[in-house]
Amino acid sequence: MAYHWPPDARAFLGYWPEPGDEPAAAIQREPVLLLSPDGAIVRGIWWTPPAGTPWRTAVVLSHPRGDFSVHYACPLLAAAGYAVLGFATRYVNNDTDCLHENAVVDVLTAVRWVREAQGADAVVLLGNSGGGSLMALAEATAPEALGDAFVALAAHPGEGVFMLQVIDPSVTDEADPFSRDPALDLYDPANGWRPWPEPCSYDPAWVERYRAAQRERVARIDAIAKESIVERDEQRAHSRTLVRGGDEWRDARQRGVHARYLTIYRTLADPAYLDLCIDPDDRTMGTVFAFPDPMDANYGFAGLARVMSARGWLSTWSGLSSHAAMADTLPAVTVPSLFVHPTGDTEIRMRQAEGLHAASGAADKAYVAIPGAAHYLTGRRREALDVVVDWLRPRVP
């Protein structure tokens, strides 16, 4: 792969390979276009070992919205002798209406292709970041085992669980991005805030109230989303009882197909970004979503779940409604499982990573920490993938 990389530059998408990740081996790449049973397009890149190198195991990785066809793990695993399908789901780069249940169909499509079309003897499901909960949901809900092994690499407990951790609970009016309850304001000096880059100090009792209020805000958004879906279903049913073409029928018909969209302000406000005494580990202050002040991520462009359909919110970003929560799915993932956690991760706490390992239903499971490494494992990727490869060698051909 040809790189045109200015000195000291970094990719906006942290999971992209960097020049230092390029293996010496002449690995092969082939674009792949698959069609899911329900007609969705699944695009990816099929990475294979150098020409003439036989392989028997395929690694499959994806993410609900990220394009993992170019994930840093792909070339390193191919150089180690595995075929790799990194792919993007139907929701690539836009999870506004992301239904994890549909993304699972895309995972099934990818696994079927590597087994049936490419002849893989074994399949490894690799879940990185938000891909961990997607792969675990796919494995847990499949009628029979999808993979022969499961790897969680810097995986968080689920996108909805993550939202419970980062949503700003001080919002008092969902229509007003500047509404706030001062008692819950992360940026109020009375609560322990100091301007970046000074460290903040939040009282543990205040943090406990903050966490409870985060759940309450998610519950309020859930209620709005669920109400809109109920109303839509009721109007759809009502339209079927009316004479077609009339004013009442037309109104009910429109309401019966209406898709409610939610604008959700301030979704990146974890006190642990600013106070390293909260769940202490090896992380630095800040978040991968802002450079450098986390306040910019909470109030500024992009962010997470800022505009969502009602059903997309409930399926993906609600920590109270989404089924893609690894604490719920991992007990059903019984294939050999490896959990690799970078202890300098600003987004995933060590207790969470250890909790995933504990929740796993696999009899053969392992937990490995990469001391001091950050979420995207920049500068430590070869080390992390060596851990994965060493663990896979005795378990898959």
Where are these regions (language model features)?
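N-terminal cap/lid segment of alpha/beta-hydrolase-fold proteins
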Residues: 2-57, 379-380
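Catalytic nucleophile-loop/oxyanion-hole region of alpha/beta-hydrolase
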Residues: 65, 90-124, 162
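Conserved alpha/beta-hydrolase
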Residues: 74-94
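Alpha/beta-hydrolase-fold enzymes
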Residues: 146-287
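Acidic catalytic loop of the alpha/beta-hydrolase fold
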Residues: 159, 344-348, 375
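Short alpha-helix in the alpha/beta-hydrolase fold that links the catalytic acid
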Residues: 165-168, 325, 335, 349-358
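Short beta-strand/loop motif that positions the catalytic acidic residue
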Residues: 333, 339-341, 345
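Catalytic histidine-centered segment of alpha/beta-hydrolase-like enzymes
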Residues: 373-385
